[in-house]
Amino acid sequence: MSKAAGKLKSLKKTVERVTHTSKLKTNIPAGMAAAGPPLGPMLGQRAINIAAFCKDFNAKTAEMKEGVPLPCRISVNSDRSYDLAIHHPPATFFLKQAAGIQRGTMTPGKEVAGMITLKHLYEIAAIKIQDPPNVLLTMQQMCEMLISIARTCGIKVVREIDPAAYGEFLEERKLIVEQQRRELQEKREAKMLRTG
C-alpha cells in the first residue's frame, strides 16, 4: 500500500498544472490600445502585462489607419504569455465605408441609409473571406452573408450607382440623421425631467 501511495505522490509532482482560460474576444481600435478601460481591466483579469500588450498591439497595427476597429482573439498561456490574432475590420465597417455613411439606419427594412454596388460587395467579400472564421465559406456564401448584413444596416445593394444622384441622396440622408439625433436628444431630456 505504501508503494502505491509513493508512486501516486511522485506522479502528482511530475504533472504540470494546466490553466484553462477562455479566449478574450474584443474589438480594439488600430493603433489606439491603451491601459485604461475597457481593455485594461479585461487584460488584468487574465494576468496579462497590459503595457507590453498595448505596445505589441500598437506596433502590429502601426501601418493601418488609426481608429479602425479590429476584432482580436487573445488566448492566454499558463506562463502569462499570450497569443494575439488580429482579424480584418468588421463587415459593417467595410459596408459603411463603401456606402460613404457614418451610421446605419435605425429602422432596418423601412429606410435606406446608403447604397453599394455588387462590385463593392465582391471586394469586401474577398477581404472578409480571409478571416479564420470565414475560411471554409465559399465566395457565394460570403456574398450572401454580406448582403444580409447590409440589409440590417439599411444599405441597399444595387447593380450601378449614379454618382450625382447618390450625392444628393447622401445630402438628404444627412438631414434625416440630424433630425433623428435631435428627436433622440429630446426624448432623453424628457426622461431626465420625469425622473428628476
From Swiss-Prot:
Location (main, coarse): mitochondrion
SMART domains the UniProt entry points to: RL11
Any single GO CC term annotated in Swiss-Prot or TrEMBL for this entry: mitochondrial large ribosomal subunit
Disulfide bond entries: none
Keyword field: Mitochondrion, Ribonucleoprotein, Ribosomal protein, RNA-mediated gene silencing, Transit peptide, Translation regulation
Coiled coil feature spans: none
GO molecular function: large ribosomal subunit rRNA binding; structural constituent of ribosome
GO process annotations (BP): mitochondrial translation; regulation of translation; regulatory ncRNA-mediated gene silencing; translation
Any Pfam family matching the protein: Ribosomal_L11_N
Subcellular location: Mitochondrion
Quaternary context: Component of the mitochondrial ribosome large subunit (39S) which comprises a 16S rRNA and about 50 distinct proteins.
Sequence similarity: Belongs to the universal ribosomal protein uL11 family.
HAMAP family to which the protein is assigned, alphabetical: Ribosomal_uL11
Name of this chain's protein: Large ribosomal subunit protein uL11m
Organism: Drosophila melanogaster (Fruit fly)
Lineage of the species this protein comes from: Eukaryota, Metazoa, Ecdysozoa, Arthropoda, Hexapoda
